[in-house]
């Protein structure tokens, strides 16, 4: 969304020039005699009629209580007693318009109507901007988007903050939607015309990928395919389905379905479900199989959609069921059925600044235990020694993007603190492409600890066959802590790596990511101290 407030600047300049011309025509004696001192300054809403009496001196407000603030009153009062010259008038009008631009009234304009100022009285009027015309192009459902502006259109003055929030919500309601707002003055004083150009995401998108992020138990090579449908049931919803597994789908296969909808009261509801089955690679006659499933609900309440900080509060619930710990374990494998039932609350905030962009996410997860048949300490401790069904987890994520000349530094820090031993799916993962690179996927887990990932990206350059190449330097580290270590189990593990990355984006929405890292510090016995690993991901963004 891109708004162009220069409309008000052009309108302000036009009215100011007209005001100065009006003063020169209505008070010709000012050019021949000394200008009178300013004795009375009236700042009025343009819709208020000029009072019949002219009694009283000093600064007076008519119908503008939101502007009658001490700082502005003090600024305008300094002109009282000063010669009433065109320069004085222009300074007063400029001060008022600057104040309007900094408040919710940036579509309102201060100007000077025709009047006789020979007696030292000046009347400045504020014309409130009102949304008189709205034209929408490119939208799949223009009527639905038009209804979002009902609260800011009509004869009422435009609330600039409310209008900005409406424009931001139009984009937020449907992932992938982008809109651009252009404002222009209407034919009547105060009239504002809004042209909104909307670029909708494709109705149907296909995608596919291949990588080596699989578990050693089921094979590291993985393939996936996905389908995304926008505007499935309405103008602001999105549904998705993705399947993945090993290339033969004989050892690992899983699916994930999602649905998100922007609600009429400007909240976001998300539903997710997943399931999968695993056939571990075991020497005969051993056989190891398992399955898992999960459902989650998220309800996001945007708090500030515009401004220096944008933030939101998200409430949710997760249910996870598994009869194995094959994929989330560096402890002995078990096949005990467990149910996880947990509530979570998350606060996220983002702020761009002159040096980059910062994002903060704080999440509290609480499991009361006893919500399902296998949501108890017996099932949990049978899967992992010391695990309890009742727990609390606090996680804090800090992300920072900082341009450094031609380079770009992207950094992410995750902190986690748990109240007890957790099942593997809730632990902090310390190895793999999305964790400490250079280590095998799921090389280490911790109930608490920290994870720090860094990329220093060089400028992109043109490569062969139309590819765009972006090289980078990688530096990752983590500390994983076990809440209650078992005999022979290390209470802390440290992991660190450094390496090189290369992203190649090509025609046809193909992208290839190569990330090679060498281990600097390894607290995982199965991962040699100075070993290395190449992480590969090939993705097709689809039609």
Where in the sequence are the language-model features?
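Periplasmic polypeptide-binding modules associated with outer-membrane biogenesis and secretion
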Residues: 32-214, 244-253, 394, 413-414
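Transmembrane beta-strand segments that form the barrel wall of outer-membrane beta-barrel proteins
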Residues: 181, 204-214, 225, 236-247, ...
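Residues that define the transmembrane beta-barrel architecture of outer-membrane proteins
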Residues: 190, 219-223, 251-253, 291-295, ...
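Repeated loop/turn-to-beta-strand initiation elements of outer-membrane beta-barrel proteins
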Residues: 204-206, 233-239, 265-271, 306-311, ...
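Membrane-embedded beta-strand positions of outer-membrane beta-barrel proteins
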Residues: 206-208, 227, 239-243, 269-273, ...
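Outer-membrane beta-barrel "beta-signal"
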Residues: 227, 297, 502-504, 509, ...
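Transmembrane beta-barrel wall of Gram-negative outer-membrane proteins
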Residues: 250-351
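C-terminal outer-membrane beta-barrel translocator/porin domains of Gram-negative envelope proteins
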Residues: 323-483, 522-527, 537-541
């Amino acid at each position: 969304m891109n708004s162009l407030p220069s409309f008000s600047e052009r309108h302000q300049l036009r009215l100011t020039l007209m005001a100065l011309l009006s003063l020169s025509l209505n008070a010709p004696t000012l050019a021949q005699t000394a200008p009178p001192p300013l004795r009375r300054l009236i700042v009025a809403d343009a819709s208020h009629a000029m009072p019949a009496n002219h009694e009283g001196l000093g600064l007076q407000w008519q119908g503008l209580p939101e502007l009658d603030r001490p700082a502005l009153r003090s600024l305008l009062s300094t002109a009282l007693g000063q010669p009433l010259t065109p320069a004085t008038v222009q300074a007063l009008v400029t001060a008022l318009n600057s104040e309007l631009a900094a408040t919710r009234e940036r579509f309102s304009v201060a100007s000077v109507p025709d009047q006789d100022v020979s007696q030292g009285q000046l009347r400045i009027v504020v014309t409130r901007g009102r949304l008189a015309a709205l034209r929408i192009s490119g939208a799949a459902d223009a009527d639905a988007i038009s209804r979002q502006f009902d609260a800011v259109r009509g004869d009422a003055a435009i609330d600039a903050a409310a209008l900005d929030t409406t424009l931001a919500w139009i984009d937020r309601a449907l992932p992938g939607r982008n809109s651009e707002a252009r404002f222009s003055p209407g034919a009547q004083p105060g009239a504002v015309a809004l042209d909104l150009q909307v670029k909708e995401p494709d109705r149907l998108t296909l995608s596919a990928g291949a990588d080596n992020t699989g578990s050693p138990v089921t094979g590291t090579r993985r393939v996936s395919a996905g389908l995304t449908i926008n505007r499935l049931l309405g103008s602001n919803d999105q549904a998705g389905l993705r399947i993945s597994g090993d290339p033969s789908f004989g050892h690992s296969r899983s699916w994930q379905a999602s649905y998100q909808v922007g609600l009429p009261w400007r909240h976001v509801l998300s539903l997710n479900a997943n399931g999968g089955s695993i056939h571990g690679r075991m020497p005969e006659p051993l056989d190891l199989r398992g399955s898992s499933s999960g459902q989650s609900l998220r309800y996001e309440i945007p708090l500030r959609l515009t401004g220096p900080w944008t933030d939101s509060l998200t409430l949710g619930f997760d249910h996870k069921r598994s009869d194995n710990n094959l994929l989330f374990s560096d402890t002995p494998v078990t096949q005990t059925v467990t149910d996880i039932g947990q509530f979570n609350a998350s606060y996220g905030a983002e702020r761009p600044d002159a040096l980059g962009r910062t994002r903060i996410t704080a999440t509290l997860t609480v499991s009361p235990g006893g919500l399902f048949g296998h949501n108890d300490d017996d099932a949990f401790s049978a899967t992992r020694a010391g695990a309890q069904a009742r727990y609390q987890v606090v996680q804090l994520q800090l992300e920072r993007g900082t341009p450094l000349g031609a380079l770009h530094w992207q950094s992410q820090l995750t902190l986690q603190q748990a109240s007890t031993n957790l099942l593997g799916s809730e632990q902090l993962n310390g190895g793999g492409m999305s964790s400490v690179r250079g280590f095998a996927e799921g090389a280490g887990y911790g109930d608490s600890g920290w994870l720090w990932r860094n990329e220093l990206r060089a400028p992109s350059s043109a490569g062969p066959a139309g590819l765009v190449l972006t090289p980078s330097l990688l530096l990752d580290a983590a500390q994983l802590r076990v809440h209650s270590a078992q005999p022979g189990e290390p209470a802390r593990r440290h992991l660190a790596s450094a390496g090189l990355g290369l992203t190649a984006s090509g025609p046809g929405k193909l992208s290839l990511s190569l990330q090679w890292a060498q281990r600097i510090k390894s607290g995982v016995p199965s991962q040699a101290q100075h070993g290395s690993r190449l992480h590969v991901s090939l993705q097709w963004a689809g039609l």
